[in-house]
Amino acid sequence: MSDIFSHTALSNLAEFSVSELSGSIKRTVETAFEQVRVRGEISGYRGPHSSGHAYFSLKDDRARIDAVIWKGTFSRLKFRPEEGMEVIATGKITTFPGSSKYQIVIESLEPAGAGALMALLEDRRRRLAAEGLFDSARKRPLPFMPRVIGVVTSPTGAVIRDILHRISDRFPVHVVVWPVKVQGEGSGEEVANAIRGFNALKPGGDIARPDVLIVARGGGSLEDLWSFNDEIVVRAAAESEIPLISAVGHETDTTLIDYAADVRAPTPTGAAEMAVPVRAELEAQLSGLAARLSGSVSRQMDNRRQGVRALVRALPSLDQLLALPRRRFDEAASGLGRGLELTTLNKRRAFERSASGLRPETLLNGLKHHRQRITERMHRAETLVERRLLQGKGRVDSFDSALRSLPARLLGQLERQKERVVTAARRADTAVLHRMAQNRSGLAAHDRILQSLSYKNVLNRGYAVIRDEENRPLTRAAAIASGAAVSMEFADGRVSAITTGEGTPAPETAAAPKKKPAKPASSDPGNQGNLF
């Protein structure tokens, strides 16, 4: 009897086809789990598919569930999913009746607390540091006075305006901006491509190669700044041949690009201050150096002049040099005559004493003989005296000539020394004037470049700038109301006008190109270059 009742109960159950049962299960599951919140670790993530969707799994230590993020949702995520990251996913459960599978369609994704992101960030930092990407030996010094500065940042917002304004105030130079996204999906790839793109520019090409790069972004949360922790961005910064300044977030924010950059700036404005010096300070230093150099040259010239005057005063006069030799010559000449007379007198007296006792013949013969000897001696004495006088006179003349030529040689040496001093002073003056002329020429060239990039050159070709009553430029017809007071600026002046009708936008066609985001107004648009 029990078997009969059991068979009857089973035969009363509703019968389903496989499709009907799968559809019923699908409706039950999707109704019961229409909105769920799941915590798990990302597994099998390989980035978005070519279709733009992202497929991966969420797992814990006991189970795994497939997950998908559709393309539209993926582009709105605040941070990029990564393999091994612990997240909290919010979405709905869907099933596939044809294969008896289910998955979660994620509508929002967030890290499982800041601790999970910080742990992932620290692990990545240690791994890249072990490769040597953060070594201080890789870092390069910034150029003292760059000619071109490359900026990688968003083309809109306050960051680029602050950088351009600060550079213009300190030392106006040419700035090239590479516009990128600084948040969201794909922003990391754009920043890395911009850094590599600047490094790929050739010197002397159509686009000036920067001398220094600034990678900048405003402040934000850890998720907002996560793109600058991407490994691709860090490697691009470390491989950059151009010195790079990191200016991401506020002073308290730290990203991995800060470790790979050559210099970290606390803010984007601080990066602009690091990139260029203050022009007024350079001019003051140059003026001070020129004044010091001029004063040093003047002091050297004065010292040399005083030395020459001291040497001239120390030289004796010609009369003083010849006084002693002349006195000695006069004494020698006067003593020679007196000695000769004394010798002759003594000989004569001796002769007279000897002749008193001789016979006349002997006396005559002896006298004749002595006279002859005396005559010969007198002749030799006269000859000797004349020779000695001539020798003495020759020596005196030679000494006199030497004494006369001595002041001339000293004066010649002094003149040559004076010429050397004057030549050195002229060379120093010429070098100083040449250097100052070069500096003035460089400053004039920069001024001409600034003038050539002024928007007023565009007005000279027939264009005009229309401004409202608050002097703001009007760039859209739809922004002008009927009866509004406007001013039109031409190359030669301004004209006031009143509009007679409301502005209407130009009709768009299907083939119209995509509009570019309007750039913010700048006080001096000529300072900013652009690649696009």
Curated annotation (Swiss-Prot):
One of its GO terms (biological process) is DNA catabolic process. Its EC number is 3.1.11.6. It is an enzyme of class 3 (hydrolase). It comes from the Bacteria. GO terms for cellular component: cytoplasm; exodeoxyribonuclease VII complex. The keyword Transmembrane does not apply. InterPro entries: Exonuc_VII_L, Exonuc_VII_lsu_C, OB-fold_nuc-bd_dom. HAMAP family: Exonuc_7_L. Bidirectionally degrades single-stranded DNA into large acid-insoluble oligonucleotides, which are then degraded further into small acid-soluble oligonucleotides. This is Exodeoxyribonuclease 7 large subunit. It comes from Agrobacterium fabrum (strain C58 / ATCC 33970). The lineage of its organism: Bacteria, Pseudomonadati, Pseudomonadota, Alphaproteobacteria, Hyphomicrobiales. The gene is xseA.
